């Protein structure tokens, strides 16, 4: 069986989407004759923890090496699951973080993970290094390991690094440094995975040395095992259910939908009474306040965060 070293800060028991993608990749690697060893974060304070994902990783017999560091999340470990701050506060903290840390505030953990990974590679033979980004700092150290040990490297882009539409570069130096770091990391990479074609095209445009053959596109999918023995739910009502799964941040906001729903409720209450809006994930306090401010009918809204095994 071939051996793959997976470097991923985000891994169970942390929750949310980025965690699940890496977990599902590693869960099924053994089916294709690959044995994964995952280097990930130790105890952290995070917006969501999902013990069902942790049990899934244990059931799959994934070897996990947990690495503590001094990144902001690790320093908040004693608080466990922490509340997501209000959006304007999150933006301020994000701007400060992006000014201080290049390429991101996980750089402390990535440096520690590099040391741990180097020791592992000295003790065991691995056939591949796999890294999923963000955080981008772990791509930097994965490329360094590839160059030192001459082991093929695959990077999985869940989000763009340089050119990300949520990216913030406080100074020209920050912008230059981010692009330079990504350029060097990509130069060391043997294969690139992206979640969509648009991301692939942007990378090809930004870095002309890349070719179409360097890429594979693997969209976000689902795990069939999550739906084994799931019984269909027969809803008694015939309401139209509109569901949003995920979180809102930056310019991704529900306020336009909520305001439009309010206007529709004035003009055609008969229509809005037959609609339910479901928000699955973190729904910020300011958005809940907007629902209250607009005096929308409470029965039209469902706010919930579920672990992935909730039926």
Predicted regions and their residues:
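Conserved donor-binding/catalytic core segment of Leloir-type glycosyltransferases
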Residues: 234-252, 258-261
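Carbohydrate-associated surface elements
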Residues: 198, 218-221
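Acidic anion/phosphate-binding donor-loop and adjacent secondary structure
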Residues: 72-78, 213-214, 221-238
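Nucleotide-activated donor-binding/catalytic signature segment of Leloir-type glycosyltransferases, i.e.
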Residues: 274, 279-281, 286-311
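A short, active-site helix/loop in glycosyltransferases that binds the activated sugar's phosphate group
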Residues: 163, 183-214
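A conserved catalytic-core segment of Leloir-type glycosyltransferases
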Residues: 41-111, 120
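N-terminal subdomain of nucleotide-sugar transferases
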Residues: 1-72, 191, 200, 264
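Membrane-proximal helix-turn-helix segments that form the acceptor-binding/catalytic region
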Residues: 137-140, 144-148, 173-194
């Amino acid at each position: 069986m071939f051996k793959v070293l997976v470097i991923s800060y985000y891994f169970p028991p942390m929750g949310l989407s980025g965690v699940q993608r890496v977990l599902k990749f590693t869960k099924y690697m053994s089916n294709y004759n690959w044995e994964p060893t995952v280097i990930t974060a130790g105890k952290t304070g995070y917006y969501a923890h999902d013990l069902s994902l942790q049990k899934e990783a244990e059931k799959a017999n994934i070897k996990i090496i947990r690495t503590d560091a001094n990144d902001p999340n690790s320093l908040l470990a004693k608080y466990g699951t922490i509340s997501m701050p209000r959006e304007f506060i999150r933006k301020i903290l994000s701007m400060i973080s992006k000014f201080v840390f290049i390429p991101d505030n996980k750089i402390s953990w990535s440096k520690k993970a590099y040391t741990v990974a180097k020791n592992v590679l000295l003790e065991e033979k691995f056939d591949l290094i796999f890294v999923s980004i963000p955080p981008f700092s772990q791509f930097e150290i994965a490329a360094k390991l590839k160059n030192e040990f001459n082991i093929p490297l695959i990077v999985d882009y869940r989000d763009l690094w340089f050119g990300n539409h949520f990216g913030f570069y406080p100074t020209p130096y920050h912008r230059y440094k981010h692009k330079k770091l990504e350029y060097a990391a990509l130069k060391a990479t043997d294969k690139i995975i992206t979640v969509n074609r648009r991301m692939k095209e942007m990378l090809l445009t930004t870095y002309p040395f890349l070719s179409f053959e360097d890429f594979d596109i693997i969209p976000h999918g689902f795990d069939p095992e999550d739906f084994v023995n799931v019984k269909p739910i027969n809803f008694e009502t015939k309401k139209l259910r509109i569901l949003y799964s995920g979180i809102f941040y930056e310019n991704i906001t529900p306020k336009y939908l909520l305001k439009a729903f309010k206007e529709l409720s004035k003009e055609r209450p008969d229509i809005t009474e037959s609609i339910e809006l479901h928000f699955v994930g973190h729904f910020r306090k300011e958005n809940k306040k907007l629902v209250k401010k607009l005096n929308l009918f409470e029965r039209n809204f469902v706010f919930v965060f579920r672990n992935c095994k909730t039926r």
